[in-house]
Amino acid sequence: MKIKYIKTITAFTMLTVLLTGCGNTTKGNESTDQAPSQNQTQNNTEERTDFYYTANESGSISKIDASTNEVVDTITEAEGSPHNIQVSPDGKVVGYTLAAKMQEGQTEHGSMSMNGFAVFYEVDTDKLIKKVGVGEHPAHLVFTEDGKYILVTNSENNNVSVIDAKTYEVTGAATVGEGPHGFRISKDSKFAYVANMGEDTISVVDIENNKEVRKIKVGKTPVTTGITSDGKTLVATVNGENTLAIIDLATYNVEKVSVGKGPAQVYIETDNKYAFVANQGTEEQPSNTVSKIDMTTKKVVTTIETGKGAHGIVVSPDNKYVYVTNIYDGTVSVIDNSTDKVIKTVKVEGEPNGISYR
C-alpha cells in the first residue's frame, strides 16, 4: 500500500521505497439476502463476459470490460483503502483486502493497528456477499484452486487468516514470518508461499493444517510470489535487491535475475513460459517498466515501458494480454504479449494497486 505498507516495514528493513500489492454506476456496501459461496452453480447459459478489476487505494474498485478496456462499474469504499484483489477460480466471486483509513489527527502507525477486512462481491451482479473481519492491516487475498479456502495475509499480526469459502467464516490462522505481504497458492491447493517483507524469507504454509512448514531465504524485502502450474518452480520479487528470485522446489536452490528498479508484483503465464515483473521504483523516483523473463533460460528477454509506478500485474488466461496497474499515474497499461507493446491505457480511480482477471 502506497502510504502504509513500506513505511511500517522500514522498521524491519530501513527501506525507503513505497510499495503501494468512472464507471457507469457506483455501488456501496449493501449485502445480498443470501451469501452464495464461490462453489455454487449458476443457471446461466449466456456467454461469459471477461473483466479485470483494480483495487484503488483512494477508496474504490474498478471493474473493466476486457473486450473494450472500458470501466463499466465502480465500487466505492468509504470505510477503508482497498489494497489487493482476486477473482475466485470459478469466476463468480471477487474478493479484496480493505485496510482502515486514517482519521483526522490519527498517526499512520495508529491506522496500522486497526483490524481490516476481506470483502466479497458477486461478479455478475456486483452485489456484496460479505465483509469478513480479519487481522491488522490485511495485504493480499488468494482463493485456493479447489474452492475450499480463501487466505489473507495480515502484515501487522505476522499471520495468515484462513476463511471457509462456503460460509465466509474465519476458521483459523497460520503464523508466518515478519511483515507477510504477497503470496500465491500451489495449483493442488496444498501450500501457500508467503513473502515476508520484514525478513528475507518466504514462508511455506500447509493450508489444511494452518501451519508454516518451511522458510526459504530469498533476499532483502521479498514482496510477493508466483508458482508454476506444475508446482516445481517458485518465484519471488526481491525489492531490496532489484531481482527476481527463482527457486527450484525440489532442491530449494535459489537463482536470481536482475530486473528493474523496485520490483513489486510478479505473474507467471499459464503455460509457464514467461514471468512478468512490475517494477514500481519509489514515489520520489518512480519506475515505469515490466520485465519479461524467460522461465527456461532465466533471462530477461525484454523490458516494456508502462506508466509511472508499475505495481500490480496479471496475464489473461489465454496469455494474449498483460495488464499492469500504474499506481502514480492512476492507470492500467494493457500490453499485447505477442508484440510486447502497450496497446491501451485505461484511466481508473486513484492509486490502483492490485489487479485480477476473470
Feature names for model-found ranges:
Residues 7-10, 18-358:
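Predominantly soluble domains enriched in secretory-pathway, periplasmic, or organellar proteins
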Residues 1-3:
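N-terminal secretory signal peptides that target proteins for export/translocation
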